[in-house]
Amino acid sequence: MKKVVILAGSPHLNGTTAALVEHMLYGAQAVGHKVERFNVATMKVGSCKACMACHKPGGDGKCVQRDDMDKIGPAVVAADVVIFATPLYYFDMTSQLKTVIDRFFSYGESMKKPKEVYLLLACGGPDAKSFAPVTGVFEGICAYLGWTIKGKVLASGCMTPGDLEKTPHCMTAYEMGQKI
């Protein structure tokens, strides 16, 4: 059994990205994995202030901000698997998800333990090439942290959950969850 953390970046809790998350979550739970889901777009997470308090010699190594990152960060550090889920916003992830990732900085080396990563990405546009910029960002983040991207669902042309249901993406997400 693996510890799986889902960081869902969409503010639409019943939207396309949420549907992908649900399918992958059910797949992972079906084979016995422990899954913790954070809907980061509805949580209170302040942006990094670049104050460097988390890296000051003699300090406690923690971010000075007290917010929902106090729950998210330790869960990610302890996870074996991290699933990033986001709709495409101007060829990138949502700002809410990016804010959480920026705050990984305060966890220093403890965040750099090997993990498996899966991407669940959705966009309304029909061209799958639209995902290239954001997948590049995730590849860079994972390379820096020493994490390995094991799978991706790139759901283009899926503006609504109804659009998504007409594609194989939900089944792909479910099966990917089972293969963790």
Kindly label every feature range from the protein language model.
Residues Y89-Y90, G125:
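A short acidic, glycine/proline-enriched capping/turn motif at secondary-structure boundaries
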Residues M1-A85, F91-Y107, G162, T167-I180:
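N-terminal beta1-alpha1-beta2 submodule of the flavodoxin-like/Rossmannoid cofactor-binding fold
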Residues S95-Q96, S106-K152:
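Short, glycine-/small-residue-rich phosphate/pyrophosphate-handling segment
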Residues A128-K129, T160-G162:
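Short active-site-adjacent structural elements
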Residues L7-A8, A85, L119-C123, V153-A155:
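Short beta-strands and strand-loop turn motifs
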Residues F138-S156, L164, Y174-E175, K179-I180:
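A charged, well-structured terminal subsegment
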Residues K44, G124, S156-M159:
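Glycine-rich beta-alpha junction loops
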Residues N39-M43, E116, V153-A155:
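A short, structured active-site edge motif that brings together acidic residues
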